[in-house]
């Protein structure tokens, strides 16, 4: 972001799966980086109950710390969720002031999505929504208000159909995810873009 100002932007944070490897100095670096001009968000932060690389209590602590950093800097947060939607919503509801942000690569159910919307968050979908067995996720995407819906790659992972399993995922493939979302919403990709 510093090398290409105005063209490339950054999010800074300690991803939940990496929190066990982090220390106070690392978080201080994140706090410092958050003040750089090219930084536009804090994260990924959040919770991951799929991998057991970091104890859940430590993930909760870092999630709280990231949210406080968002409040201190007025930057939005990018929330990682993997098999942790209910825990994330519960933790967000305990906040007196939920920072703005996005539910990154959303995979939860409608109840979780609706709670996130009620908390003022945007909901973002990656290639997983295009997978054949993702009917329930597509139904959630269909119900998200257009002004709160985002489309992403989650590069280098989660390439959409017809590239599923091929890595690295890349920005050019987001078109396939967009087309899928447009189809389930009954609009053209151009209109949704």
Describe the residue ranges of each PLM region.
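Mid-domain alpha/beta scaffold segments of enzyme catalytic cores
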Residues: 1-193
């Amino acid at each position: 972001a510093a090398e290409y100002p105005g063209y490339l932007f950054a999010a800074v944070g300690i991803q939940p799966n990496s929190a066990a490897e982090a220390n106070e100095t690392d978080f201080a670096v994140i706090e410092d980086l958050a003040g750089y001009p090219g930084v536009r968000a804090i994260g990924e932060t959040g919770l991951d109950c799929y991998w057991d690389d970091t104890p859940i209590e430590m993930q909760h602590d870092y999630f709280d710390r990231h949210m406080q950093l968002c409040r201190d800097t007025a930057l939005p947060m990018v929330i990682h969720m993997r098999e942790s939607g209910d825990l994330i919503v519960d933790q967000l509801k305990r906040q007196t002031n939920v920072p703005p942000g996005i539910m990154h690569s959303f995979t939860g159910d409608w109840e979780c999505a609706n709670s996130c919307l009620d908390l003022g968050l945007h909901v973002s979908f990656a290639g997983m929504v295009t997978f054949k067995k993702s009917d329930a996720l597509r139904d959630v995407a269909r119900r998200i208000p257009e002004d709160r819906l985002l489309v992403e790659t989650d590069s280098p992972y989660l390439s959409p159909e017809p590239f599923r399993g091929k890595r690295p995922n890349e920005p050019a493939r987001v078109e396939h995810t967009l087309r899928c979302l447009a189809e389930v919403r009954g609009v053209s990709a151009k209109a949704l873009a």
